[in-house]
Design a protein with these regions (language model features):
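Structural and coupling elements of P-loop NTPases
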Residues: 1-608
Length: 608
């Protein structure tokens, strides 16, 4: 038994203070030297994670407290990264359930907690952000108990210990009105409540690979908890898949464990510890890394299937190559293969067309994160409209992914939200008061109706509403939905947009370009107010005359162009359209740029 090791995961809804809590736990436990400069948001290592305030990739860290090593695994808090969550929980012996003292139990809390309880973890409940003026700790504790009951928690799990805390201020206490001095009571409770796993150090080495990182120096680095035996540098090892088939064999060239957030090389890792090993180039997530004499794989949690796919190809617009550095199909393919290897929530396949690739993931955010990362790396590409991945039941009926949507809005907006969800085939499950003139509405709705809905929701609630979505499961196909009602305003030729032309076209619809923006034939430069595409000239300047009034030629006022994210633009696409992505620009376009070719294609009915 590894009595001096505790492996815990932190479960929390997005922005409930998880990463900040970990920051302060590490600082107060002495994980850093007194003179060491420490960044905020230590566990958010990616640029996008720090920008968006969400955890995308799970990552371990460790704290030494009272002669015990506490390995902390920060789990993603968003539904699209469920694949990460499931694997991370397999490394944990216990969990901290962090809940905002004002917002209370939220969808992501329910989603990850359900998986943790199913694996038999016994959480410590931490009511966080108690320094909020609108905190309602007692009500939130009651809601939490009700949530445990609804998730079929057993008696031991229902008898959870509770701490009241402020991660930002750096204190935790067993009582609401405790002394509020530091986080030491929480660290003590972790050691007391979380029981170390009973593991046998005498058996041959075996470890489930739960995370994978690409390292330019070490090659493939695999992270996992040693389930039995000890791992020693330079020992022969192999990887076997879930069927027990050998997929790789080699030597354990390097072994590391975490001290704080840093990897430190060690000679021996023992059962119960979370380590990083290198030496196998073909091993993957969910494989068992083990001694040569081990033949039984460690069971791995099934991973939820992807629900959405996009097609990515080389940038074929007339502006291709003017803004990016990575342009070829080979570069795109290699990048996507690497992503699929490192992120089991993403799957990769190649279309019949050699230069076209299909990427499937767990939702809009996962796909948007990938496209944003590639954009920052200098890629140019063309992306198709997202497609929902359907399944069939035993009778051959079509099933589609259904999401649970929880919204918190002012009462005056609730009818608008109900109406907008009805149009998306949403069904209202619950409506309740959450405070003065505040409502919480819960819906079930098909994923395909929710693409780009967040921006629409914020418009309907004038920026005051909060929306959360979670994958519920597959349900019966809810029937066809209306697509975009606005026709596209399409550029008739290549050139640069002119202010005079845009000014005169503004009355015909919303424009996506401004003065001097490059445009090309087939590029969507705006949306018409009614159905039906319209080809327009945005390069037409004012005719010169002999008699010119001084100061009037340039006196045009252009409506500012709406700034839209990748997800918003993808949600706008019809089946015959695409999105051009470059490091500097996002451009909507027709899949076939030439209008004559488009008409031929429409008549022939050839799929794009």
């Amino acid at each position: 038994m590894s009595n001096n090791i505790r492996n815990i995961t932190i479960i929390a809804h997005v922005d409930h203070g998880k990463t900040t809590m970990i920051d302060n736990l590490m600082k107060q436990s002495g994980s850093f030297r007194e003179n060491e400069v420490v960044d905020e948001r230590l566990m958010d290592s990616g640029e996008l994670e720090k920008e968006r305030g969400i955890t995308i990739l799970a990552k371990p860290a460790s704290i030494d407290w009272q002669n015990t090593r506490i390995n902390i695994i920060d789990t993603p808090g968003h539904r699209d990264f469920a694949a990460e969550v499931e694997r991370v929980l397999s490394m944990a012996d216990g969990a901290l359930l962090l809940i905002d003292s004002a917002e209370g139990v939220m969808p992501q809390t329910k989603f990850v907690l359900a998986k943790a309880l199913k694996q038999g973890l016994k959480p410590i409940v931490v009511i966080n952000k108690l320094d909020k003026t609108d905190q309602r700790a007692d009500e939130v504790l009651d809601e939490t108990f009700d949530l445990f009951v609804s998730l079929d928690a057993n008696e031991e799990q229902l008898d959870f210990p509770v701490m009241y805390a402020s991660g930002r201020s750096g204190w935790a206490d067993k009582e609401v009105d405790g002394p509020r001095e530091n986080l030491h009571p929480l660290l003590d409770l972790i050691i007391e409540h979380v029981k170390p796993a009973e593991l046998d150090k005498t058996k041959p080495f075996a470890m489930l690979s739960t995370l994978l990182y690409a390292d330019s120096f070490l090659g493939r680095s695999l992270v996992g908890k040693i389930s039995q035996g000890t791992a020693k540098a330079n020992q022969p090892i192999k990887a076997i898949n879930l069927k027990g088939e050998k997929v790789d064999e080699g030597r354990l060239t390097k072994i590391f464990r975490y001290e704080g957030t840093k990897k430190v090389p060690i000679e021996v890792g023992e059962a119960g510890d979370i380590v990083v090993i290198a030496g196998l180039e073909k091993a993957n997530v969910a494989d068992t890394i083990c001694d040569l004499e081990v033949n039984e794989p460690i069971p791995a949690t099934p991973i939820d299937p992807p629900t959405m796919s996009i097609t990515i190809s080389v940038n074929s617009s007339p502006l291709a190559g003017t803004e990016g550095k990575k342009l070829t199909s080979t570069q795109i393919r290699d990048r996507l293969i690497t992503e699929a290897q490192n992120n089991v929530g993403i799957s990769f396949s190649q279309n019949e067309n050699v230069d076209t690739f299909i990427i499937s993931g767990r939702g809009e955010l996962m796909l948007e994160i990938l496209l944003t990362q590639m954009r920052r790396e200098g890629f140019e590409m063309t992306v198709s409209p997202p497609k929902v991945l359907y399944q069939k039941d035993d009778n051959g009926n079509r099933l589609e992914p259904i999401e649970e949507i929880t919204v918190d809005v002012d009462e005056e907006f609730s009818s608008k939200i109900i109406d907008s969800m009805n149009r998306r085939k949403g069904k209202l499950l619950d409506l309740k008061d959450t405070g003065k003139d505040k409502k919480r509405l819960i819906f079930h709705a098909p994923t395909r109706g929710l693409m780009g809905y967040t921006s629409r929701f914020l418009t309907l609630t004038k920026g005051t509403g909060v929306i959360n979505r979670i994958f519920h499961g597959y349900g019966k196909f809810e029937g066809e939905m209306d697509g975009r009602k606005n026709g596209a305003l399409i550029s008739m030729a290549n050139g640069k947009a002119v202010a005079f032309a845009i000014f005169n076209l503004q009355a015909r619809g919303e424009m996506f370009v401004t003065h001097n923006d490059p445009v090309y034939e087939g590029m969507i430069v705006g949306l018409a107010p009614k159905p039906g595409d319209m080809i327009i000239n945005v390069m037409k300047g004012k005719q010169l005359t002999n008699m010119r009034t001084q100061g009037t030629d340039e006196n045009v006022v252009l409506t500012p162009v709406r700034q839209m994210s990748i997800a918003e633009q993808l949600s706008m696409l019809n089946t015959d359209e695409a999105l051009e992505i470059t490091p500097k620009s996002l451009r909507l376009r027709k899949a076939i740029l030439n209008p004559t070719e488009r008409k031929k294609n429409e008549k022939s009915g050839t799929p794009l």
